[in-house]
Amino acid sequence: MFKNYLKISVRNLLNKKGYSLINILGLAIGLATSLLIVLYVLNEWSYDKFHSNSDRIYRVVQTMTSEDRVEEQATTPFRLGPVLDAEFPDHIEKTVRFFDMQEENHTFLNREDQVSFRESNFYFVDSTFFDVFSAELIQGNPSEALKNPLSLVISEDLASKYFGDENPIGQSLSYKGIRDMTVTGVMKSWPEQSHMKIDLVASFTSLNEIYASSPGYDRSWLWNPIWTYILVKDGADTGSLNSQLATLEDKYYRAYSGWPKDESVDIELQPITDIHLTSNRDQEMEVNSSITYIYILLVVAGFILIFACINFMNLSTARSMERSREVGMRKVLGGHKQQLFYQFIGESFLVTLIAIILGIIILIIALPFFNELTAKSITFNPFDNIYTIPGLILLTAFVGLIAGLYPALYLSSFEPVDVLKGNSTRGRKTTIFRKALVTFQFTLSVILIIGTSIVYMQLNFIQDKDLGFDKNFVVMLPTNQNLIAWEFENFKEQSLNHAQIQSVTGLGKIPGSEHTEYYRYVPARNGEGQDALNLVLHVTHDVTETFDLEVIAGRSFSRDFSTDAEKAVLINRKMLSQLDVETPEEALGETIYHYPPSGEREVFTIIGVLEDFNYTSLKKEIEPLILRLVEGTRPILGYIEHTAVEISPGGVTGALEHLEKTWKEVNPIDPFEYRFLDERLAEIYETETTMSALSTSFSILCILIACLGLLGLASYSAQLRKQEIGIRKSLGASVADIVGLLSKDFLVLVGIANIIAWPVSYYLGSKWLENFTYRFDFTASLPLLFLGSGLLIIIIALGTVGYHSVKAALINPVNAIRSE
């Protein structure tokens, strides 16, 4: 019996090659795309789960709250780790601290052959690192590797980069030319699926050597440069531990002498496996993704699969009139309804099986392009995982059942007497159902088109928005505690000798980025008792010229005033609110007190007010900002991390060559590396950019699948109405009349789909845009979005239906009505 069902199914597929191809291709594309999305989602969900104790590892984070600011921080003070060990020994097994010197790049030099590289994935960590995280050592002893000061563990890739085929154990690498570190271990490359990227780790005790001249570097509870992780004991009540963390505020934070009186802190635990998809705090180690986008992608995957199944159901039921006589004859010859059901559902499973195989081939071909688009390294081998093959079998059964159940039930229920007489009205009864399915497809297509357009318009808005400073043709050079910091004026003077280099300045953090620094700067007029943590940017001369910052009152820093380096600050317009003044001019001459963690109060005078600019990313509102000059009598080491060079648009290549030459003359140890500021800022929105590319690609695929179904339906509709078309042409109907007749029904469905999709798209778009403080004028763009998407989907539908409509209209009416 099974052999007979299979033979009939294959024969039916071959007899109707066009419909079979549409069904198989639509399902294959839908399945391949859905599997691709599932692979991406599984990759995102797998972050940090490679640790053997991933269910017991937590990151300790804190939220600082004052009257005018809430700051969610991923980092904590130096001393929090040891305090946690001491305060909660019943809950915590181990703690690990990470510190990156608050620098993006670190230079390591092999003194023997003078090979140096700048590394970004470097941290000082506690010796418990290997006890908490599943970092596998290829060489070295995990219990001893990070025990002593100036010990260094490197990845196997870096071992080859610095030492070639030599054994790296016991060899030295110079850290920034100031300390030699001994390689005590080589670990396997850190997995990609982690919220932290690690290539090198040094012992935390090394900091005592590096900060030997500043013995109190780790005592402040206001300085929060440390990522703190804990391994809770097996069976520990993390809920209870979370609630007990509140006791640390009064006991340690507020007990610190410099703690602002109006500042409160909330400490909480984050499961390490949740960080990548749910955390978006200040000072994250890497740009994280978003669980919202994962849910969106899963919904899109479901939509695509539903689209493909709808196509199958539509085409199967559309052919009901053609197959009704087959059903009638089989029933007259003794066929039972159950047997016919099995035959039709078997055809569905056969189509699905072929589509699965073709879909996997499409998936394998598309995967390299998908990885390039998403910057992933996703692989697919059905034999790598014991669950893959059973999963594909279940998927085949599920899709085959969902896609084929209704057509099988429908076709097997025909009454033989009616269909053999040609009196069956079931074809008409399914019309509403088919139209509903087509409308559903195009509703989702319109939603995807509008959603993709919203993401695209928001990203364009971010890229084009006036940030209040010039980001174009500005080159950023890392300047963190290297020779450039000591020879800054020399480097600047030589750089400016090139005609295409307009200006050079140094600054602590990159404008427009996510990295910020807060210090205790207090307006004097508010009184000694008024505490505040304000955003501070350390700069050198010419910062306003390099970034084209607008001075709206007073003046910028000037070499004509020797006291600027020790006595003067600039503020932005937003800072006026803390000074209780109405105009920028009134702020000039006002006093600002700075209370450093150690040392006496410093007094500064406001010499200028700048127009507000987006110092942080566009996801945040503009905050009060103070610019402090650290050039002149004060060494810039420790304050300036970047050098910004403004280049004339027409001379980029020559200017870069001159910069590289100058760099190597002044600083022969560190490699010359640069980034354009606009490219650097674009990385902040990497997640949104990836989602935009994915949503665009998947929207196109959804529309393609919908069009495949519409193509089949239009073809069958034209075939069913062949005699009607012939009669109409005989009575004088033109080609345009026939095309309009066949297209009208489909265009009505597209119109209904637009009406349904518009309010849904408006709601979803509004919710997504709430993630951005600055966004394009969504309301004003609605007519363009709605009418544009509607027009696009109508053009697509007309193009799809029009081909078969014109083809049907051009048929000789004599041939069309001959059978009548």
List PLM regions with ranges:
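Transmembrane alpha-helical interface segments in multi-pass membrane proteins
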Residues: 26, 326-367, 702, 723-766, ...
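Hydrophobic alpha-helical transmembrane segments of polytopic membrane proteins
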Residues: 388-407, 446, 703, 707, ...
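Hydrophobic, regular-secondary-structure patches
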Residues: 44, 53, 58-121, 128-131, ...
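Hydrophobic alpha-helical transmembrane segments of multi-pass inner-membrane transport and secretion
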Residues: 15-41, 288-325, 353, 433-458, ...
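Alpha-helical transmembrane segments of integral membrane proteins
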Residues: 1-24, 283-286, 315-353, 357, ...
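Membrane-proximal juxtamembrane linkers immediately C-terminal to transmembrane helices
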Residues: 42-63, 88-90, 136, 179, ...
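Mid-to-C-terminal secondary-structure elements
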Residues: 125-139, 152-289, 490-687
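Membrane-helix entry/capping segments
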Residues: 1-11, 15, 51, 249-301, ...
